[in-house]
């Protein structure tokens, strides 16, 4: 069985790591490369960088950040935000990213998923899905784009199945209702999508405790857990999380001594 993964997420705006609640009220959380190094050394399995301003302001993700990170960390990392062309994907992968995350551009032009997966391999293509509960419906979610500002009307589960068909290697699934709240992952959302597809689902949005992370693996059936404010606020460390999960008999890659 493949080991479950812990993945710190670094939301980047104007060259700094930021974190907010429900995608707003952003606060500064530090330098991206410094934090990447810290989490890599602490035992993170992978990292995710999301340039949360790029899609909104139509700016490309900084290749420079990727290049500096690639020189500083040894674990795989994904970069996303404003990536809307094969040329940009190529530039980021050549700069040192292991994977790219597509969101708004994939909804606007689904062909970019199949084109990029054929050119670079499915293992390089992550599709980020920002999901919000449909009004007054507990078990249906809609896809949002433009940093969570625009409702596409697309059903999350149907879109997840579609991106898998087109060649996505992984889904980064964010509960916008839970983002930054530390109130727990949306287990129903995560499990529903994980059961609907055969590719790994990374759960994002709401981690606030050791139990939340355990639950998203066991009840939510996620392949990986994205962690942000929980780590940035130093509420827990990766080592503490891994020790807890290993003691709970989950298959986790232990920290190298």
From Swiss-Prot:
Reactions that this protein is recorded to catalyse: 5-[(5-phospho-1-deoxy-D-ribulos-1-ylimino)methylamino]-1-(5-phospho-beta-D-ribosyl)imidazole-4-carboxamide + L-glutamine = D-erythro-1-(imidazol-4-yl)glycerol 3-phosphate + 5-amino-1-(5-phospho-beta-D-ribosyl)imidazole-4-carboxamide + L-glutamate + H(+)
Main localization category: cytoplasm
Subcellular location: Cytoplasm
Enzyme class: lyase
Function: IGPS catalyzes the conversion of PRFAR and glutamine to IGP, AICAR and glutamate. The HisF subunit catalyzes the cyclization activity that produces IGP and AICAR from PRFAR using the ammonia provided by the HisH subunit.
Assembly information from the UniProt record: Heterodimer of HisH and HisF.
Protein family: Belongs to the HisA/HisF family.
Name recorded for this polypeptide: Imidazole glycerol phosphate synthase subunit HisF
Gene name as annotated: hisF
């Amino acid at each position: 069985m493949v080991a479950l993964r812990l993945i710190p997420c670094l939301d980047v705006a104007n060259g700094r790591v930021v974190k907010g609640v429900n995608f707003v009220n952003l606060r500064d959380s530090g330098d991206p490369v410094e934090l990447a190094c810290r989490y890599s050394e602490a035992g993170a399995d992978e990292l995710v960088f999301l340039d949360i301003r790029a899609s909104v302001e139509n700016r490309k993700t900084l290749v420079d950040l990727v290049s500096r990170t690639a020189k500083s960390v040894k674990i795989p990392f994904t970069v996303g935000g404003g990536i809307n062309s094969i040329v940009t994907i190529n530039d980021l992968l050549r700069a040192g990213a292991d994977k790219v995350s597509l969101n708004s551009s994939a909804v606007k032009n689904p062909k970019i998923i199949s084109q990029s997966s054929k050119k670079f391999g499915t293992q390089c293509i992550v599709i980020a899905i920002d999901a919000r509960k449909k009004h007054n419906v507990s078990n249906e979610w809609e896809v949002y784009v433009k940093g969570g500002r625009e409702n596409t009307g697309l059903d999350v589960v149907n879109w997840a199945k579609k991106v898998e068909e087109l060649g996505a290697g992984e889904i980064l699934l964010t509960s916008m209702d839970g983002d930054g709240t530390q109130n727990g992952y949306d287990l129903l959302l995560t499990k529903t999508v994980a059961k609907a597809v055969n590719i790994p689902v990374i759960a994002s949005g709401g981690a606030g405790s050791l139990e939340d992370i355990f639950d998203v693996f066991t009840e939510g059936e996620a392949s990986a857990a994205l962690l942000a404010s929980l780590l940035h606020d130093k509420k827990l460390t990766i080592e503490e999380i891994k020790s807890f999960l290993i003691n709970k008999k989950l298959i986790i890659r232990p920290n190298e001594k």
